[in-house]
Amino acid sequence: GKLTLAIEMFKGTYDRSFFHQLISSQLDMDRMDYLNRDSFYTGVAEGNIGAERIIKMLHVVDNQLVVEEKGLLSVENFLVARRLMYWQVYLHKTSICSETMVLKIFERVKDLLKQNIYVDIPKHLAVFFNRNISKEDFQNENMLLQNFVSLDDVDIWYAIKNWQNHNDTVLANLSQNITNRNLFKIKLEVGLKTEGLEANILQNFEAKKIPKSFQK
């Protein structure tokens, strides 16, 4: 059916291979979409890649996706923009700290539930805290997948705001801090640990079969 066809395109087993390149490649539609979207919402101009021009420059030759020569500069700008967005947005210290705090909040909720301590959780979110779910569970239980795709930022923030007033101090403090943007701090470790460093370097040289004349 249609779902089988979509899966074949995504995995690259469909005979028209350019569909896979459009869906999942270094120059796919998803990357163009999220770069423009995230550039708009974060105000980072470097992510504005001119996706419409790139799409107009795309063609299919021998079942492969190709780019017109005059579109190469736009593709180069796309690759540079993606790298800049990772450093300025996705790997920014604020993003990393926020993500870590959300994970710690969820870990704390699971710990409390294991101790039979009540935590108010929205129904379609609770299923992910009450049991350990594997990839196979998603494949075998349609209800799990439906619950997952129904979640959005509003559900997560609603739960976190409720947990600000929980009796557990750890959960309450974490929830209050992320709500009030009092985020974790990144601590940089100064100084290079050199113990065993030379031995590791030599071992890597040997593994890559680099001649000894180049090792010093």
Question: How would you label these PLM feature ranges?
Answer:
Residues G1-K216:
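Histidine-centered, transition-metal-coordinating active-site segments
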